[in-house]
């Protein structure tokens, strides 16, 4: 037994070992000699009452005036694809460990804060970001907090905690602003404009609204794309739960996650509520300065650093950047694809337009300068470093440390550039297993999710109203370096436009594969779209020529690549259909789902029509059987 400290529980366990009882008694008497501030007790009880007994654990030290409080934040409300992309375990709470003065509590020194997941030892970059946020929040609150001030706030709450159960009736349906109940039947909407306007049934409908969510609600199992699961297989997403973060289009909503929760229930409940507000929107803010990202197409799925140089330097020292070794070990094919996209963009005649973002890479020999700086672009030096990045195939066949040493000898900027390529990707990409879309005729098939929680939720809301279907989007591989980091944007009438906009402004799609395959081959000086007959001939020729390598090849063998995306699109009146060319002017109504890559001029079947019931059934089969895990 640890003689230095004890866990403070309501009921002391009775052990049979006399010596153990003796040690516990000595330790308990030491702790009893230290004064424990009653406001601390009150705040702990508030956490237990509002959340659960298991939401807080306390470690008291017998000889020093310190106490550690572990606050457990339930994150099961995160979607499966979000938690996977963010590298967090949604089945395990995030723990906030705060160390206070036992006798002074809020009148004492500002508490230290640690953020962790017990089973997530490596690469918990999200915890570092959340720690910075909560440390900043606590520092601001500590300027005016005191035990006396909090006591007056807490006394307002005590009148509700009566033996007659008034608080239970209150929580059952009167207030939409109270902290999270233990087992609510509906989410808590915290927008002040909705106060008094919504009843309980409307609150349930609020699941579809752009609001943050209680971390303790019990959630039904819903698939990621809103489709019924295949009876023979599991869902793509075992649980889809929770509400999205605020929409950035509304000033009121966009600032919602930074609203300061009430102190009426104590400081511990306040910081838990603030953490719950911030977690779903971490991708919308710079991981260093906590300022909101500004992108043409809104935020992306993965958290990222902003472009400020100071933030870039801090980002490299903060430890939130993905380790290249880990990514190569767990997703080598995805890293291989990312490098290929970067190379295609860098070698394009249009690189000054489409190679965006340009890398921000700290010089390994001088950590105070940028070796690659967006303000001072040097494409030749960048090309030299990229040429020194060894093939991902080689990286998987030997010791990563040895391979890194070889790269460092070739070019000291090669490995830092590889790290940037991996960490700057803001989309979630997973190589599909053998249960892929067979009609696409390529082994290089990927699940591609780039929509942040807010956009995905807006998409689901629109889908419930208008329905959805699938369509192809063709774009040359040189464009995908930017798409993975900035999203699928409306390029019509902008410098990004390459093909014209004969049918108006919007994202161009087609249910017919031959049309999108034509667009996917355009770029790098090729500005004539092949006809359907040419594509069919090419497809037939590529499938009759003996293959020099297996179609099941794990890695890309060629630099001559074509690619095409399969997107889900809302079938509202906004979707303009001009025969087999569709234009969607609302970017929120298009979400990428799958991505396909072809080598050496290969193309898939040019006769595919996503509106064919057989094709739709095949898409549904893959969605139903594709289960990806951490």
Curated annotation (Swiss-Prot):
The gene is Parp6. The modification ADP-ribosylcysteine is found at residue 237. It is an enzyme of class 2 (transferase). Auto-mono-ADP-ribosylated. One of its GO terms (biological process) is protein auto-ADP-ribosylation. This is Protein mono-ADP-ribosyltransferase PARP6. The lineage of its organism: Eukaryota, Metazoa, Chordata, Craniata, Vertebrata. Belongs to the ARTD/PARP family. InterPro entries: ARTD_PARP, Poly(ADP-ribose)pol_cat_dom.
